[in-house]
Amino acid sequence: MPERGAELYQCEGTQNLWSDRGRIRDHAMIGCLKLRAMHLNLRRRSMVAKHLESNNIPGPRKFMAGPWTCSRWQGAIFLLICGLSGVIPSARAWAKEHVDLVVAHGTLVTMDPTRRVFEDGAVAIQGDTIVAVDSSAKIDSMYEAGKVIDARGALVLPGLINAHTHMSMSLFRGLADDLSLDDWLHKYIFPAESRYVTRDFVTWSTQLTLLEMLRGGTTTVADMYYFEEEVAAATKAAGMRGVLGETLIGFPSPDSKTPADGLAYTESFLKHWKGDPLITPAVAPHAIYTCSEELLKDAAALARSNQAPLLIHVAEAPFEIEKSRQEHGLTTVQYLARIGLLGPNVLGAHCIWLDQADVQTLAHFGVGCSYNPSSNMKTAAGVMPAAELLAAGVAVGIGTDGAASNNNQDMFEEMNLAAKQQKFARMDPKALSAVQVVEMATITGARALHLERQIGSLEVGKKADLIVVETSAPHATPMYNVYSAIVYALKSSDVRTTVVGGKPLMEDRRMLTLDEPAILANAAKYAAQIKASFGAKSN
């Protein structure tokens, strides 16, 4: 009889094979053992090897050192031998592999390189990583899950990527509207920030934004603001993924009296969060019109020395281009290229006022861009040449910008407006298709943030960031094309479940990591204070 443990790998009808009754059956048994070994951990493999050695069964030693593979004809021969010899693998031999989570029975929109869509698809997740993407039937036959999320009647998408916002500005939502960007910034926002922005303000405002984004299907956010230590702590506690940039600016800010203080704070921030699984710390010089050339160069050097992303507003409004031409004789993009700031670690927000040379320069340096249609429309800043940038090979993501200039964090609304704005601006209904827009909110947005190897699509080996979006509402019925439905019909309120790194953060619309009543209560408290002292209009 085999030693203890060998019965785990035995096959029905082979009880007498251990006495080496025939070469054919021996090799059939070896085949069973080989196939089973593909799914065993190292401890079990060693048990199989020990059994084979003790019974003098020849030939299978090599497969114990690593995964065993066979060609189709070898597999066919093995199955034929099994049939001739009466050797049939038992149910125990083909036991399912355990995984932590399976999301099943939804219409799976993978956004992988071939843009596969499974009508009844499933994703298997172990830890924070996707281990399988296939039909629900196939996943069910292979895996046993600790938890199953039933996605019937819904789409399963990669989590949405908000490529540009200012999370801590949500408490300024509606404070100053219907203004030009220049007036909005200099007459209202900068004064309000100097007066109200504190660590506590940033913490609660960030949590308010995280609450809105998770409810709307955003799983990764690129943020620029002050007190990013607090932003990072709140984001990590909520379980969201973030590329978070500490803002550098050329005048006293809420967390730094001088640019030198800001650089020191930023360097400490980079070192503190480096290597975190959810938080990617970044350097964020505000813009060329608020930062000196010296500060811009120092910011670029700091980002490079720490291998960190750099986030910056680029060519957002006409006044910026005029200022750049007057002071430097160059466009914003050409000026940034001249001083050595551009590179593959850079994300430029807005990128509206570009000429053809600017587009080619951004492509040459591998710069990512964020398209923020709502904010740009509201401040009449202009329309990004998104189609031209994409055609040149520039990775363009979609962002909301801060709630103070938008006034929400709704990525479904941004997708809808992105497609329609491009069509209207060019008088071309084919400009920026629904598929392209979904790409911009997922895999191309990941490219813009230089995170495409980790997120942006539902593929084996990538982080398990996904959302479940209901399609049963009247506004989503019927659904002939999933991409058209996502861009033109679905709403953020249709998001049912949000998963980041394999962890459900919202399930069946119930928040699991954020205290919604406390967040809303604190938001109301701050709003009352700001309205009383700042004189925000009530009508």
Model region roles, listed by residue range:
Residues R338-N345, A387-A473, Y488-K491, K503:
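His/Asp/Glu-enriched, well-ordered alpha-helical/loop segment
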Residues R173-M240, G262-G275, A524-Q529:
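Alpha-helical scaffold segments that flank or form the walls of functional sites
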Residues W94-E97, E230-I352, A357:
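Metal-coordinating catalytic core of metallo-dependent amide/deamination hydrolases
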Residues L171-W204, R241-L263, P318-N345, F365-G368, ...:
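Active-site gating loops and adjacent loop-to-helix segments of metal-dependent hydrolytic enzymes
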Residues L42-R44, E53-I77:
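Bacterial N-terminal signal peptides that target proteins for export
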